[in-house]
Amino acid sequence: DEGLKKLSSIGDGYNGFHGIGMMASMGKKANISTFYSLQNEKNNSWNHVVGVNVTSKWKKIKVGVTAIENISKPTQAHVENDTKNEPQSEKRGTNTQALIGANARYNYGKIDLWGEVAVSQGTKWGIAGITGMRYTPVSDVYLLAIYRYYSPYYSNPYANALCSWSRMRDEHGGYIGLEYNKLKNWQLSTYADVWKNGYEVMAQGDWLPKQNYHMHMRFRVKEKDEACTYSLRWNM
């Protein structure tokens, strides 16, 4: 939602952007950016991507809209690897995909609200949405709450949002986190993430008595698809 950046990284080597882009300001409150990417791979595969982003700021509100058109001819090996967890109707892959998203952020004192909704058009339309709130009651104390929903047919190779899987697909859940940094030389954090097929709970403490000394301890419990794992890590 920020338009073009000097340095960025997206996905793997296949999903990276290689091309040109430009950004223009529309007064002091808005800017528009656009880009075009062309990538040729071995085995006669190629990928064309064109996109546009418009972002506007007004007092404490920021809104943005992004549209991307992706036309590609992936290799058969990439299709099989990229779609092995997708619904059967999508395993053939698509040569053309449209992505449209809108986002908004609002700050009210100690509360920061944000959200984003997007749709993807491939063999079927899919929708995804994520919204969250960050509350800072006092300095160095942060509370975070997030809710997400990704439909089974949503597909976006460029997205990198909160998800229990590597791909944003067929999931809905809630996340609550706390960070507490008011103790001298200590950084404490914890979170709980619950989705339809599992959950994850984590507690972490970092002790930094000196600039070149760091002690780190983390405890995590995770259940995913009826498989439960426990982990305890201690680093010095």
Positions of predicted regions on the chain:
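Signature for the C-terminal beta-barrel architecture of outer-membrane proteins
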Residues: 3-236
